[in-house]
């Protein structure tokens, strides 16, 4: 079924592109004769949308070389008429990103340092409006208040641009085509909100309909923006889309090689499953497109989301998608379009990234049930499979370890056949060719599958237990992904204890199964289980330590 839905998603996307092509080829002659006026007037409503877009890129203390490569890639991106860069930080260490921006775009560019992040303005304004309504004993209309807050933020952004006397777009000598915004350090959601508000104002000046949103470690290809927009432009009911992703640092370490196969196989198939019905539940942060008309009504509630009494900053991508779906907008996945992102180079960093993504998934999947009442049932099916499968696996393995009985029947031949079908399909149809010659890259596929699925139950369960833990986002290279300091002491990362414990449980359960299969005695089985747990546990500890 997954393969069929993946193919259906590509077919539906291609049909939208064909519809767009038909709209573009339609005659643009306004009036042939007087009696054709009404016909032309109706055709205007169905005319081809403008495909130009602007791009918004956000980051915090990114590696300078990688950031420069990412910014430079937009100079070749088809259809990108304006680039907005958001830097989350205004301290001395944050100036390097601004310098990189100025180096990448020395002409027709400008930098604005904001006195206050617009997210804080929105929060304060909303609290004031709510207090005024309560003081006057008036009912609180949440949507109306959010609308007023959004209008205030947009007006403030307009005022800031006017104060700096920037000539946005155009062909004049002073025209600005790249703008860098710098604000006090908050979190990724904070700089995204500021960038989105300014994007609405700039897009209105330029007359563009679409916004590409990305991260400071993502490199786009010449057709990444244009082909993603092509997949939604002809359908006015679709508010967002995301493209596929490849890993541009796949050859750096063993971890990055393994992670690249996960993007190749897992991402391509799982994201396509629900996207065939325009109900994709997550627009990837590095490669998302939004219809700008969909953003004003969702940005304030998205930014001010509260879960269990706590403001959420970890689930910016998924919650933005959820808000679009709740407002009736479709969200699709352009699986045949690619952009290149960065992946952590160490096991410790990779597990932390997986934890953050898993927490965001749980919040949106389990705590926002209204979305399933307004969307295709396929979205609920995808959620149930994703949320309960790893939990069941963790319970079943632990249950076997404690009782020597199987909780659920497992067919190894069935699992093997599913893996072979998935691998074979990806080799044939996946637009990502893994970057190198066939065998050199594909020999990592099976290890990559194990690399992903072995820790998955532990990541899934632990992220549920630590649901509201915070973090800026995926760790920037400048914050720990650079080479370690020589001769620095090795210290354990105690927040990886969940992974070490899970590997011990898994090793003990596997040893117990082998002992039963080969008819070991009780003492031999116990010794084998203990030895396996110690060896695997020590290995798991070793691969999660870092240099300080």
Descriptions of predicted regions:
Residues 2-12:
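Transmembrane alpha-helices and immediately adjacent membrane-cytoplasm interface residues
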Residues 4, 385-471, 501-548:
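Membrane-embedded multi-pass helical conduit in multi-pass membrane proteins
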Residues 10-30, 413-421, 470-480, 526:
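Interhelical loop segments of eukaryotic multi-pass membrane proteins
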Residues 18-384, 388-389:
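Non-transmembrane catalytic domains and loops of membrane-associated enzymes and transporters
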Residues 91, 465-491:
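Membrane-interface alpha-helices
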Residues 114-118, 270-278, 363-373, 394-408, ...:
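Short, surface-exposed, charge-dense and proline/glycine-enriched linear segments
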């Amino acid at each position: 079924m997954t393969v069929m839905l993946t193919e259906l998603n590509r077919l539906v996307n291609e049909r939208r592109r064909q519809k767009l092509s038909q709209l573009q080829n339609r005659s643009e002659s306004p009036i042939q004769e007087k009696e054709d006026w009404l016909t032309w007037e109706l055709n205007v409503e169905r005319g081809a949308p403008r495909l130009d877009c602007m791009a918004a890129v956000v980051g915090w203390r990114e590696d300078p070389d990688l950031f420069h490569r990412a910014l430079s890639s937009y100079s070749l991106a088809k259809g990108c008429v304006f680039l907005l860069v958001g830097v989350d930080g205004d301290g001395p260490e944050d100036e390097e990103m601004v310098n990189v921006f100025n180096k990448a775009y020395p002409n027709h560019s400008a930098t604005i340092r904001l006195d206050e992040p617009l997210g804080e303005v929105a929060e304060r304004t909303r609290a004031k409006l709510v207090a005024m309504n309560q003081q006057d004993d008036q009912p609180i209309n949440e949507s109306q208040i959010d609308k007023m807050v959004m209008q205030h933020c947009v007006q403030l952004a307009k005022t800031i641009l006017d104060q700096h006397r920037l000539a946005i777009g155009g062909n004049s000598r002073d025209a600005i085509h790249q703008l860098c915004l710098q604000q006090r350090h908050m979190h990724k959601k904070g700089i995204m909100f500021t960038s989105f508000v300014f994007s609405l104002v700039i897009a209105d000046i330029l007359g563009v309909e679409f916004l590409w949103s990305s991260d400071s470690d993502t490199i786009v290809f010449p057709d990444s923006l244009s082909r993603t927009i092509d997949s939604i432009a002809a359908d006015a009911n679709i508010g967002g889309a995301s493209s596929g992703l490849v890993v541009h640092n796949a050859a750096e370490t063993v971890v990055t090689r393994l992670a690249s196969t996960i993007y190749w196989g897992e991402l391509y198939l799982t994201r396509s499953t629900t996207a065939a019905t325009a109900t994709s539940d997550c627009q990837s942060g590095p490669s998302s497109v939004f219809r700008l008309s969909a953003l004003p009504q969702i940005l304030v509630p998205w930014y001010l989301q509260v879960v269990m009494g706590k403001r959420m900053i970890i689930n910016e991508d998924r919650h933005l998608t959820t808000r679009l779906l709740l407002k009736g907008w479709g969200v699709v996945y352009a699986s045949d379009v690619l952009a290149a992102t960065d992946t952590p180079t160490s096991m410790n960093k990779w597990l932390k990234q997986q934890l953050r993504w898993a927490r965001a998934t749980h919040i949106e999947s389990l705590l926002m049930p209204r979305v399933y009442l307004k969307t295709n049932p396929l979205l609920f099916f995808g959620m149930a499979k994703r949320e309960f499968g790893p939990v069941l696996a963790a319970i079943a393995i632990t249950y076997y370890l404690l009782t020597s009985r199987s909780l659920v029947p497992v067919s190894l031949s069935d699992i093997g056949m599913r893996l072979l079908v998935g691998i074979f399909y990806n080799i044939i149809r996946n637009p990502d060719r893994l970057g190198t010659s066939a065998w050199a890259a594909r020999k990592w596929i099976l290890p990559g599958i194990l690399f992903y699925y072995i820790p998955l139950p532990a990541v899934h369960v632990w992220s549920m237990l630590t649901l509201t833990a915070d973090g800026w986002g995926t760790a920037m290279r400048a914050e720990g992904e650079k080479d370690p300091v020589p001769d620095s002491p090795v210290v354990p990362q105690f927040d990886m204890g969940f992974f070490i414990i899970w590997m011990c449980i898994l090793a003990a359960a596997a040893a117990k199964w082998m002992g039963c299969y080969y008819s070991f005695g009780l003492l031999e089985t116990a010794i084998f289980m203990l030895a396996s747990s110690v060896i695997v546990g020590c290995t798991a500890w070793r691969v999660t330590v870092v240099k300080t």
